Swiss-Prot record:
Belongs to the actin family. Residues 1-40 are annotated as: Disordered. It is found in: Cytoplasmic vesicle, Secretory vesicle, Acrosome; Cytoplasm, Cytoskeleton, Perinuclear theca. Changing A42D: In a colorectal cancer sample; somatic mutation. GO terms for cellular component: acrosomal vesicle; actin cytoskeleton; perinuclear theca; sperm head. CDD domains: ASKHA_NBD_ACTL7 (cd10214). It is linked to Spermatogenic failure 53: An autosomal recessive infertility disorder characterized by impaired oocyte fertilization due to oocyte activation failure, in association with structural anomalies in sperm heads. This is Actin-like protein 9.
């Protein structure tokens, strides 16, 4: 791999060229979730009180109204801060920038409110929510129920804090906290399935049965999209391409558009380099040539590097381990409902490689069906949109009066 200034070459590719998307598997529905059509949402929730679904991940935060097919706004889960210049009164404050805008100015101090999917900076998280709700969606939060997604193994105190923020800070009339994995299953029109979710900050395999997480059989890998981006950035630096924090979007674009999963890593390594080498033209006119890095990058998800004291396993082995912790009957059911989710599962070749490895790992008689929806990077949000639109769900909201009577602990009775 090497980087250089612009030169004429017909083999160069522009970053504007979209990466071909993977072909979705047949969506075999097992035990379907009853759902109303999106067009009926207005009959249930008047526009002024329509529920808002918020799915905040380590990489992006998605927000939109329940009943929509996709989120209205998606922003990077990042906050940029710098001191304000003192006003005439002599008071100073903090100026903040949300999402992609925070990366543009190198002098900003960047804050990432989530770590491995878990909120660790509540002030920063609330600023992002407020910006999305009040500035982007332009809603008055005291008029709208709010549904938040919650990751596996989230601390109980985080769920209590979500309730407090929703009612005390955002002044919402009602709220709900829903499991991310369960919402992903709902997005596929089911109530049971093995969720294989690899996003920006963490990777999980979570069995969901009849709408409940089976945490005893859940596997976790602290390696996901941000690690792949860091790997690719290091390769670009070694090629002599200087990068700053404002170039992170550039690295992400290269990763999403050109990296792919090899069906057989060793065979791909043995191919002549000219068969997979790509020369890319960057927006600033520079060029960079990428070779094996294009498939070595997402290979980390299938063969994670060893770390001292740990021997992490890849996605396919994680899925096998989750299934083996289930009863035989449940294992057979969920093996036919393996659901790929998360933005880091969108690489070309990902679905085929995962399916082939899982089939080899399980007994020959196991019937395996892997579903890979084209919009699986939005699976959690879509599931929340479906759930908050159902007539049967409307009695499940945690209401302000209930919170005032019972405090944040109401979340355990109403949401889990």
């Amino acid at each position: 791999m090497d980087a250089s200034r612009p030169k004429s070459s017909e083999s160069q590719s522009s970053l504007e060229a979209p990466r071909p998307g993977p072909n979705p598997s047949p969506n075999v529905v097992n035990k379907p979730l009853q759902r109303d059509s999106p067009g009926m949402v207005a009959d249930r929730l008047p526009p002024k009180t329509g529920a808002v679904v918020i799915d905040m991940g380590t990489g992006t935060c998605k927000v939109g109204f329940a009943g929509q097919a996709s989120p209205t706004y998606t922003v990077a889960t990042i906050l940029g801060c710098q001191p304000k210049k003192p006003a005439t009164s002599g008071q100073s404050g903090l100026q903040t920038f949300i999402g992609e805008a925070a990366r543009v100015l190198p002098e900003l101090t960047l804050v990432q409110p989530l770590r491995s999917g878990i909120v660790v900076d509540w002030d920063a998280a609330e600023l992002i929510w407020r910006h999305l709700l009040e500035h982007d969606l332009r809603v008055a939060t005291h008029d709208h129920p709010l549904l938040f997604s919650d990751p596996p193994f989230s601390p109980a105190t985080n769920r209590e804090k979500l309730v407090e923020v929703a009612f005390e800070s955002l002044r919402s009339p009602a709220m709900y906290v829903a499991s991310q994995s369960v919402l992903s299953v709902y997005a596929h029109g089911r109530v049971s399935g093995l969720v294989v979710d690899t996003g920006h900050g963490v990777t999980y395999t979570v069995p969901v049965f009849q709408g409940y997480n089976l945490l005893h059989a859940t596997e976790r890998l602290d390696l996901a999209g941000n690690n792949l981006t860091a790997f690719l950035a290091e390769m670009l630096l070694q090629a002599g391409l200087p990068l700053g924090q404002q170039d992170l979007d550039l690295v992400e674009n290269i990763k999403h558009h050109y990296c792919y999963v090899a069906s057989d890593f060793q065979k791909e390594q043995a191919r002549p380099e000219q068969e997979y080498k790509r020369t890319l033209k960057l927006p600033d006119g520079r060029t960079v040539t990428l070779g094996k890095e294009l498939f070595q990058c997402p290979e980390l998800l299938f063969n994670p590097p060893e770390v001292p004291g740990l021997s992490p396993v890849g996605l396919s082995t994680m899925a096998k381990q989750s299934l083996r912790k289930l009863s035989l009957e449940m294992r057979a059911d969920l093996a036919q409902n393996v659901l790929l989710c998360g933005g880091s599962s969108l690489f070309t070749g990902f679905e085929g490689r995962f399916r082939a490895e899982l089939l080899r790992a399980l007994p020959a008689e196991t019937h395996v069906v892997v579903a890979a929806q084209p919009t699986r990077n939005f699976s959690v949000w879509i599931g929340g949109s479906i759930l908050a639109s159902l007539r049967a769900f409307q009695s499940c909201w945690v209401l302000r009066e209930q919170y005032e009577e019972q405090g944040p602990y109401i979340v355990y009775r109403k949401c889990y």
